[in-house]
Amino acid sequence: MRRLAAFIVAVIALAVTGQALAGPPIANGGGRGTVDGSTPFSQFGFGVRFGVAGAASGSFNCLMAGSSAFPGFEPLMKVSGSVTSGSVNVTAGTASFTGSGTLNLGPSGRMDALFLVDVREGGPGVGKLHLTVLAPFFPVPEETVLTGQISIH
């Protein structure tokens, strides 16, 4: 009986150690997105580390300029900032995070912005990125990864 108890304690200790070594969940990625399956819409990059109780930290950048210009906002629309909170489901391959930073509209000026981003892991044709500028409010269509990769681990 003592051997069985010692074995159970050892298995639990190894499981806990393995979880601790795995570290916190991370969502990261970069590439180009599309809303129609073929035309570039944005260039994006992010890295987010998720903690407990909604805590998260990292950075987010999304640029629509040049070949990825957002109609009505030429020549530039850029959202960049620091991630302040979020949630992740590693098993489902999804994450959501919020943050604050800057909305840059080129000649129309810069302003403080709050943003929300929802992502789904995957490469071209599979990965998803949906940016919503919360303040000033500005919805952006959901994008599918055209080139690049979104990873959640």
Where are these predicted regions, by residue range?
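Low-complexity, intrinsically disordered Gly/Pro/Thr-rich segments
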Residues: 45-46, 124-139
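Edge beta-strand at a domain terminus
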Residues: 81, 132-153
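Cleaved targeting-peptide boundary
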Residues: 23-28
